[in-house]
């Protein structure tokens, strides 16, 4: 997570932003400079671009039986394959706890049929999303949320939401309902060994207020807003015990009606973060926290489309699979005493970074939302050979596997190795969008239908549409050849010059139109068949990013006839008449991001805080840190090469394409050297 956010930074630091919202929406602003170099002269334009994001969404969240993960428990109580060493536990009861031999033998008989299932991801996600929702409350930005309307003069789109934003809540409250819900049966526990087979939580370092917070996060979660992270969740256990020195009664008194809502409010975000920090640190749940943070970030937001077709992306909600809760860490007081076993180096690094700057989760979510949509769109584009050297043998099966779906999109977009979620059978996916030609019908109000594929007052969209500009992750190695996504490219001569224009291949035509739009020109064109309804390349005024047009996915269209280059009313840089052989010059184009800030409403502007990679040095004393050579498959990454997308165990950086198609070959030669060592 941290390394993904800092991937393009030259000084090993990154801009981080705290969660913010204006009725479920916020805007990211970038300051951009584009240089045009030709005839040994350099002209430039400095301009602002913006991208809206929405926190609104309604993911389908499933809680299924998952795998047990005992990482973090003391090494001497685990077997070589990561299971619990029961004999060592029983010996510890005899030697250290002073339990008589016959009592230990009786206990050993009782536990023969017990489950030793341990998975805290569901609880950690509840705690983490409660923290973010409470931050919105404290900023005066908590609301039900709404999706902004789209109106371009041709069509109008207003997608419905479940809860009216004007009638929704204005502050975060306990997500359970004491008047209708049944709550888990919980009890305080401090004995040396358990007597019944239920989850046992170890919350010994937490204050009473923090323990109450954990207990309430174990309860049912009702969806009270339209925000994606405010998803419905069942109570995590029917009954459980918590290991603590005191019996905590505040939550029980509130449930029984002995305390009012005002007397038992959710704690501040600072207290929530403190509880999360203590719970993860004491239970050594670094690996599981990594998984929880990944899942929450992957569903937290989506870009608000700047074109009508892009609204098809907002009509699809994620399918999320989360493992059911279980905990054995509190069953014995000594399980967490000693060196923590099998902690993954990346998880430990991200944990330290998030505790130093919780804004990392929100910033990462912004970047993932852009890369996910862009990667899914580029998957379809690349199948035609646009901007890459792939053919029909190209392997993209990683998109079809739920556990690698998101990572496949990230790798397809950025060229980086995209780390998996760190746990098997835990994922975010979009099952309706697995096929290239999936059709989405967007309900619209038609004003002027020219240029749109409209059937019965619905805009018909094939495949995953591009919904945003890439400036939040810019530059990225989206293709194997130089192009606008990578920040540097050259406008080359046309394939053929005619009296009324010039003929380009599809990639070169897009590069030409992109540069001309930034300079202040419109590019008009024709293509074979002329069935797509487009006559010029489109770019939204808010970001000036010329999208790859839909016709590139048409196998019958091989070339683009640029018929005219027209100066816009707002013109910025004088360029040669590039579609004429008499005036053509080779133009080098380079783009740089200077500054980024986010805005939620007219007066809420948030500038970046920064975190330095050299500052994030996780304490590994008493922790067995494992490196890439010892990872299980679910700690690998999805890698993009010229042969396709595949899962690998090592991580290496993306290679930004230059004038030659080097990305695929270079990927197979460059390997990031793992600097993590095994700490015994």
UniProtKB/Swiss-Prot annotation:
Keywords: Acetylation, Capsid protein, Virion
Principal place of residence: virion
InterPro entries found in the cross-reference section: Major_coat_LA-virus, Major_coat_LA-virus_sf
Family: Belongs to the totivirus major capsid protein family.
Organism the protein comes from: Saccharomyces cerevisiae virus L-A
Cellular compartment(s): Virion
Any Pfam family: LA-virus_coat
PTM comment text: Acetylation is necessary for viral assembly.
Gene3D superfamilies per the UniProt record, alphabetical: Major capsid protein
Classification via SUPFAM superfamilies: L-A virus major coat protein
Residues modified to N-acetylmethionine: 1
The name this protein goes by in its record: Major capsid protein
Stated role: Capsid protein self-assembles to form an icosahedral capsid with a T=2 symmetry, 40 nm in diameter, and consisting of 60 capsid proteins asymmetric dimers. The capsid encapsulates the genomic dsRNA and the polymerase and remains intact following cell entry to protect the dsRNA from degradation and to prevent unfavorable antiviral responses in the host cell during all the replication cycle of the virus. Nascent transcripts are transcribed within the structural confines of the virion and are extruded into the cytoplasm.
Superkingdom classification of source: Viruses
GO CC, one annotated term: viral capsid
A biological process term (GO) from this entry: viral translational frameshifting
């Amino acid at each position: 997570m941290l390394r993904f956010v800092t991937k393009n930074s030259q000084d090993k630091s990154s801009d981080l932003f705290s969660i913010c919202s204006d009725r479920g929406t916020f805007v990211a602003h970038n300051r951009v400079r584009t240089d045009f170099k030709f005839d040994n002269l350099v002209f430039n334009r400095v301009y602002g671009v913006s991208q809206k994001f929405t926190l609104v969404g309604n993911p389908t969240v499933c809680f299924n039986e998952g795998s047990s993960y005992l990482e973090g428990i003391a090494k001497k109580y685990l077997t070589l394959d990561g299971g619990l060493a029961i004999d060592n536990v029983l010996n510890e009861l005899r030697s250290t706890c002073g339990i008589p031999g016959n009592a230990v033998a009786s206990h050993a008989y009782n536990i023969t049929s017990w489950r030793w299932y341990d998975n805290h991801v569901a609880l950690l996600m509840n705690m983490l999303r409660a923290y973010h929702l409470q931050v919105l409350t404290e900023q005066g930005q908590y609301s039900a949320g709404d999706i902004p309307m789209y109106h371009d003069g041709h069509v109008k789109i207003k997608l419905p939401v479940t809860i009216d934003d004007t009638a929704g809540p204005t502050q975060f409250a306990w997500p359970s309902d004491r008047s209708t819900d049944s709550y888990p049966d919980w009890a305080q526990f401090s004995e040396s060994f358990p007597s019944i087979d239920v989850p046992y939580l170890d919350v010994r370092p937490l204050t009473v207020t923090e323990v109450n917070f954990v207990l309430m996060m174990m309860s049912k979660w009702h969806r009270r807003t339209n925000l994606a992270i405010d998803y419905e969740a069942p109570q995590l256990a029917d009954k459980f015990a918590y290991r603590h020195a005191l019996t905590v009664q505040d939550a029980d008194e509130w449930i029984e009606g002995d305390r009012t809502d005002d007397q038992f409010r959710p704690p501040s975000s600072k207290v929530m973060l403190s509880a999360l920090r203590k719970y993860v640190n004491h239970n050594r749940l670094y690996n599981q926290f990594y998984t929880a943070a990944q899942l929450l970030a992957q569903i937290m937001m989506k870009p608000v489309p700047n074109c009508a077709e892009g609204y098809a992306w907002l009509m699809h909600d994620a399918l999320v699979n989360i493992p059911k809760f279980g905990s054995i860490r509190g069953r014995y007081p000594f399980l967490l005493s000693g060196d923590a076993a099998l902690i993954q180096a990346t998880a430990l690094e991200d944990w330290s970074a998030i505790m130093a700057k919780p804004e990392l989760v929100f910033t990462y979510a912004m970047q993932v939302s852009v890369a996910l949509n862009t990667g899914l769109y580029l998957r379809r584009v690349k199948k035609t050979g646009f901007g890459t050297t792939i053919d029909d043998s190209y392997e993209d099966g990683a998109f079809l596997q739920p556990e690698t779906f998101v990572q496949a999109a990230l790798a397809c977009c950025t060229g980086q190795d995209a780390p998996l979620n760190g746990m098997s059978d835990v994922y975010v996916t979009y099952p309706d969008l697995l096929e290239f030609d999936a059709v989405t019908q967007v309900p619209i109000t038609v004003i002027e239908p020219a240029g749109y594929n409209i059937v019965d007052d619905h805009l018909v969209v094939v495949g995953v549409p591009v919904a945003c500009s890439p400036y939040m992750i810019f530059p990225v190695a989206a293709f194997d050849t130089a192009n606008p996504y990578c920040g540097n490219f050259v406008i080359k001569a046309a394939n053929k010059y005619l009296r009324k224009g010039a003929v380009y291949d599809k990639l070169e035509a897009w590069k030409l139109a992109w540069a001309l739009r930034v300079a202040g020109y419109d590019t008009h064109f024709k293509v074979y068949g002329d069935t797509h309804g487009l006559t010029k390349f489109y770019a939204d005024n808010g970001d000036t990013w010329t999208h790859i047009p839909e016709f590139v996915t048409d196998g019958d269209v091989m070339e683009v006839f640029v018929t005219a280059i027209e100066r816009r009313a707002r013109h910025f840089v004088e360029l040669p008449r590039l579609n004429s052989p008499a005036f053509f010059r080779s133009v080098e184009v380079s783009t740089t991001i200077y500054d980024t800030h986010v805005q939620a409403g007219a007066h809420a502007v948030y500038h970046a805080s920064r975190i330095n990679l050299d500052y994030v040095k996780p304490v590994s004393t008493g922790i067995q840190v494992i490196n890439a050579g010892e990872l299980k498959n679910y700690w690998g990454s999805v890698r993009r090469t010229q042969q396709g997308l595949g899962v690998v165990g090592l991580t290496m950086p993306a290679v930004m394409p230059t004038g030659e198609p080097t990305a695929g070959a270079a990927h197979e030669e460059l390997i990031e050297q793992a600097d993590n060592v095994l700490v015994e």
